[in-house]
Amino acid sequence: MTITKADLAEHLSNEIGFNNREAKEVVEAFFKELSDCLERGEEIKLAGFGVFSMRNKPERPGRNPKTGEEIPITARRVVTFHASGCLKSAVESSPNLSLKAVKAA
Protein backbone atom coordinates (compact mmCIF):
# COMPACT_ATOMS: atom_id res chain seq x y z
CA MET A 1 0.00 0.00 0.00
CA THR A 2 1.25 3.47 -0.85
CA ILE A 3 0.34 6.49 1.25
CA THR A 4 0.72 9.85 -0.46
CA LYS A 5 0.97 13.34 0.99
CA ALA A 6 -2.58 13.89 -0.25
CA ASP A 7 -3.73 10.82 1.71
CA LEU A 8 -2.08 12.17 4.87
CA ALA A 9 -3.68 15.59 4.35
CA GLU A 10 -7.08 13.98 3.83
CA HIS A 11 -6.63 11.96 7.04
CA LEU A 12 -5.74 15.14 8.97
CA SER A 13 -8.78 16.84 7.52
CA ASN A 14 -11.11 13.98 8.46
CA GLU A 15 -9.66 13.08 11.87
CA ILE A 16 -8.65 16.46 13.27
CA GLY A 17 -10.96 18.79 11.42
CA PHE A 18 -8.42 20.86 9.51
CA ASN A 19 -9.70 22.27 6.26
CA ASN A 20 -8.01 20.85 3.13
CA ARG A 21 -5.64 23.81 2.69
CA GLU A 22 -4.49 23.70 6.34
CA ALA A 23 -4.00 19.94 6.22
CA LYS A 24 -1.87 20.17 3.06
CA GLU A 25 0.23 22.96 4.62
CA VAL A 26 0.84 20.88 7.77
CA VAL A 27 1.92 17.84 5.74
CA GLU A 28 4.21 19.93 3.50
CA ALA A 29 5.74 21.70 6.52
CA PHE A 30 6.35 18.36 8.26
CA PHE A 31 8.18 16.83 5.30
CA LYS A 32 10.12 20.03 4.63
CA GLU A 33 11.36 20.03 8.22
CA LEU A 34 12.36 16.36 7.94
CA SER A 35 14.27 17.07 4.72
CA ASP A 36 15.95 20.18 6.12
CA CYS A 37 17.11 18.33 9.25
CA LEU A 38 18.54 15.46 7.22
CA GLU A 39 20.31 17.87 4.84
CA ARG A 40 22.00 19.41 7.90
CA GLY A 41 23.05 15.92 9.03
CA GLU A 42 20.76 15.94 12.06
CA GLU A 43 19.12 12.83 13.46
CA ILE A 44 15.30 12.77 13.61
CA LYS A 45 13.72 10.79 16.45
CA LEU A 46 9.98 10.18 16.24
CA ALA A 47 8.96 8.62 19.56
CA GLY A 48 7.19 5.30 19.12
CA PHE A 49 8.05 5.21 15.40
CA GLY A 50 11.79 5.31 14.79
CA VAL A 51 14.91 7.28 13.93
CA PHE A 52 15.95 8.75 10.58
CA SER A 53 19.65 9.58 10.23
CA MET A 54 22.32 10.20 7.61
CA ARG A 55 25.18 7.78 7.06
CA ASN A 56 28.31 8.27 5.00
CA LYS A 57 29.13 5.32 2.77
CA PRO A 58 32.73 5.12 1.53
CA GLU A 59 33.72 4.42 -2.06
CA ARG A 60 33.77 0.71 -2.79
CA PRO A 61 34.39 -1.59 -5.72
CA GLY A 62 31.39 -2.68 -7.75
CA ARG A 63 30.83 -4.77 -10.84
CA ASN A 64 28.90 -4.23 -14.06
CA PRO A 65 26.53 -7.24 -14.07
CA LYS A 66 26.48 -7.47 -17.88
CA THR A 67 30.21 -7.28 -18.58
CA GLY A 68 31.73 -8.25 -15.24
CA GLU A 69 33.92 -5.13 -15.47
CA GLU A 70 34.92 -3.76 -12.09
CA ILE A 71 33.77 -0.17 -11.55
CA PRO A 72 34.07 2.08 -8.50
CA ILE A 73 30.89 3.00 -6.64
CA THR A 74 31.40 6.56 -5.43
CA ALA A 75 31.21 7.65 -1.81
CA ARG A 76 27.82 9.05 -0.86
CA ARG A 77 25.47 9.95 1.96
CA VAL A 78 22.36 7.85 2.49
CA VAL A 79 19.30 8.18 4.71
CA THR A 80 18.80 5.30 7.13
CA PHE A 81 15.76 4.41 9.22
CA HIS A 82 15.71 2.31 12.37
CA ALA A 83 12.28 1.32 13.65
CA SER A 84 11.55 1.80 17.34
CA GLY A 85 10.85 -1.17 19.58
CA CYS A 86 7.18 -0.13 19.73
CA LEU A 87 6.86 -0.16 15.95
CA LYS A 88 8.70 -3.47 15.64
CA SER A 89 6.43 -5.06 18.25
CA ALA A 90 3.29 -3.73 16.58
CA VAL A 91 4.37 -5.06 13.19
CA GLU A 92 5.44 -8.44 14.54
CA SER A 93 2.18 -8.96 16.44
CA SER A 94 -0.05 -7.74 13.60
CA PRO A 95 -2.71 -10.34 12.71
CA ASN A 96 -2.58 -9.06 9.09
CA LEU A 97 1.03 -10.17 8.69
CA SER A 98 1.46 -13.65 7.29
CA LEU A 99 4.63 -15.51 6.41
CA LYS A 100 3.39 -15.82 2.81
CA ALA A 101 3.13 -12.01 2.52
CA VAL A 102 6.64 -11.59 3.92
CA LYS A 103 8.11 -14.16 1.51
CA ALA A 104 6.31 -12.58 -1.46
CA ALA A 105 7.77 -9.12 -0.71
Curated annotation (Swiss-Prot):
NCBIfam families the record matches: himA (TIGR00987), PRK00285.1 (NF001401)
Single GO term (MF): structural constituent of chromatin
Name this protein carries in UniProt: Integration host factor subunit alpha 1
One CC-aspect GO term: cytosol
HAMAP family with a match to the protein in the record: IHF_alpha (MF_00380)
InterPro entries given in the database record: Hist_DNA-bd, Histone-like_DNA-bd_CS, IHF-like_DNA-bd_dom_sf, IHF_alpha
Disulfide-bond pairs as recorded: none
Keywords: DNA recombination, DNA-binding, Transcription, Transcription regulation, Translation regulation
Zinc-finger listed as a keyword: no
Pfam families xref list: Bac_DNA_binding (PF00216)
Biological role: This protein is one of the two subunits of integration host factor, a specific DNA-binding protein that functions in genetic recombination as well as in transcriptional and translational control.
Superkingdom, natural source: Bacteria
Entry similarity comment: Belongs to the bacterial histone-like protein family.
Gene label: ihfA1
UniProt xrefs under SMART domains: BHL
Subunit structure: Heterodimer of an alpha and a beta chain.
